[in-house]
Structures are given as C-alpha cells and as structure tokens.
C-alpha cells in the first residue's frame, strides 16, 4: 500500500505544480508521457527477462488453475461493460480500457492518457489503485466468503508483486505459484488490451 500512496502523492504533486504554472515550457512542448512509457516498457521487459525462475516455476501450476487469468480478464471486462450501462456519459471502450489495467495503474494510466487524454488517464490511475487497495484490505473477507482464489482474481496484475504477501497469508503458501502465474499472465495482457480498446 505504501507504493500506491507514493504514486498518488506524485500525482497530486504534479497537479499542484501544473496549477501553480511552474513547469518549464520546453517540458510541456515535448511528448514526455510517451518517452516515460517507452522507458517503463523497457524496464518491464528487463524484469521479466531477468527472472527466469518465475517462468520455470509455472510448470508446477495445476492445468485447471491456468484458466484463472483468463477468467479474471473476462470477468473484469464483463463488469466494465455492465458499468458502462450505468455510466451513460462514458463509452463502452473507455470503460473496457480502464478495466484492462487490472490494477497495473502505472502502465495503463500512461497508455490511456496517451490515447484518450488526461481525464480518462486520471480515472484509470485512481480506478486501478483502488483495485490494488481493495485486494490489500479485503483479502481476508474475500477468502472467507468467496474462496481462496478470490483475492488472486481481484488482485489482477498485482498478484505477482504488491498483493502477493497478503494473498499468501490469507490463501496459504500453496497458492504462491498460482498467484505469481496469474499476475504474470494478466500483467502481460495489459499493454495489448489497453491499446486495443483505446484504438477502437
């Protein structure tokens, strides 16, 4: 949760700096968000390439549980489609793009800002931070009422890093590999799904 609060803090700081009009003009003229996005994608690629032990551990995952990331993605998109019916002022593709962040707020919000503008990018940032915080705070209740896979599915792309400790504590150590596999697959889908829905 500390990491989420730091991200929100920088976001608020950026708003304050923008309102106070103290940003150098040259910085605003350039396509800074695109440059940051390229650097972020490069770092994500490095982290996946360097951690080969994670890829090797996936062979121990129960074949039935390999469907969990697919169910998480489909369930999230179905929920976003339903939400778009209630939010008449938002397009279906906007809601699907936001939901396709799956808790990966840093990457998805930059993509959405790039394609659809800062307003939708801000909504994506806050929505995906809320998903992570919901997992961190409600994991015990999710296990109690919906089963041990529930916090993994709710955690989305965060289950291989920030929410892994709470999932391990609530669901048990036997779900560590499942959680990492789930997070890896959902995480991998984010840039493809977000850009797909943003381009529609």
What feature does the model see in each segment?
Residues 189-200:
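Juxtamembrane boundary at the C-terminal end of a transmembrane helix
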